[in-house]
Regions:
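Cytochrome P450
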Residues: 1-320
Length: 320
């Protein structure tokens, strides 16, 4: 049986679960002839990969994703040259600093642990508890905007605008820039993993990302001069013996928070509601027992995850 599966092809995600089953049953380590990526599908094997960063590294993730499975920098093209020229002009950042910049989801231990500590400054139990009333208020506002008894588009009218509003407020971003944040986030994701993968430096993606980085650089500079009570200020705060982020690293951190707090939450809401509609007996049970909602969220993350893959680069020959 020949299984056609490419983990970086957008067409792979319309209904991946029958393919996952076939992979587990007949090809637990599967190589895509189109991209060269290997897919590991069995739980024990996935766990083995994730627990061995010395053999399976996160560091080359972005370069590999944007360059068709190759670790070297992209070949020169007009798009790439245009990007290199426009990058410092638009962002006032050094494009050649990015390959060496530390990134939370593209680093291995012990550096990864150091960067996690930076993020944890902004997600202490006290801060999370302080945000909860405002997040509940925003949920009520977005639900209140839906007209009772009339049809609505769950994703467009609720699941998209709510996470954008929440993460923008947490980051201390002006309300009038929230539409820009959604557009920027979409460009980052689409250029790296979606339809833009075939041409990741195309102007339609690059211009939006450069606009985002320029905005974040200015916002970060303001927080360094005058810290506030927002998430950006918390991440930039100097901890005793802690890590100070470079300008490039700070932009990457905030960009990651924007994307992680936006697209994933939208997908989670949509997937969870679809699963409940597909299983009306579970929907009825949750309605009868609202205390089950926290467990519902956890199960939705497992049952139809908003993020379907994690990427690693083998540092040596390995047998699973």
């Amino acid at each position: 049986m020949v299984i056609e599966f490419d983990p970086i092809a957008p067409t792979s995600w319309a209904d991946p679960y029958p393919t996952y089953r076939a992979l587990r049953d007949t090809a637990p380590v599967h190589r895509s002839p189109s991209s060269g990526f290997y897919s590991v599908s069995r739980y024990e094997d996935v766990l083995s990969v994730l627990k061995r960063p010395e053999a399976f590294s996160s560091r080359a993730m972005f370069t590999v994703l944007m360059n068709g499975g190759k670790e070297e920098l992209p070949a020169l093209s007009w798009d790439f040259v245009r990007f290199l020229v426009r990058f410092p002009l638009r962002t006032r950042l050094n494009p050649f600093a990015f390959p060496k910049a530390r990134n939370l989801i593209a680093d291995d231990p012990p550096g990864h642990g150091t960067l996690r500590n930076v993020v944890n400054r902004g997600f202490t139990p006290r801060r999370i508890a302080a945000w909860e009333p405002r997040i509940r208020e925003l949920v009520e506002q977005h639900l209140g905007a839906l007209r009772r008894g009339e049809p609505f588009d769950l994703v467009h009218d609720f699941a998209i605008p709510l996470p954008v509003t929440v993460i923008a407020e947490m980051l201390g971003i002006e309300p009038e820039r929230q539409r820009d944040f959604k557009r920027w986030s979409d460009a980052v994701i689409e250029g790296a993993t979606g339809a833009g993968r075939a041409r990741p430096f195309a102007p339609v993606y690059v211009d939006a990302v450069l606009e985002l980085m320029a905005y974040l650089r200015r916002a970060i500079a303001r927080r360094r001069r005058a810290p506030g009570d927002d998430l950006i200020s918390a991440i930039l705060a100097d901890a005793p013996g802690g890590t100070r982020l470079s300008p490039t690293e700070a932009v990457l951190f905030v960009q990651l928070l924007l994307v992680a707090g936006n697209e994933t939450t939208t997908n989670l809401i949509g997937n969870a509601v679809q699963a409940l509609l597909d299983h009306p007996e579970q929907l009825a049970r949750v309605r009868r027992e609202p205390a089950l909602v926290p467990a519902l969220v956890e199960e939705a993350l497992r049952f139809d995850a908003p993020v379907q893959t994690v990427f690693r680069t083998a540092t040596r020959d390995v047998e699973l």
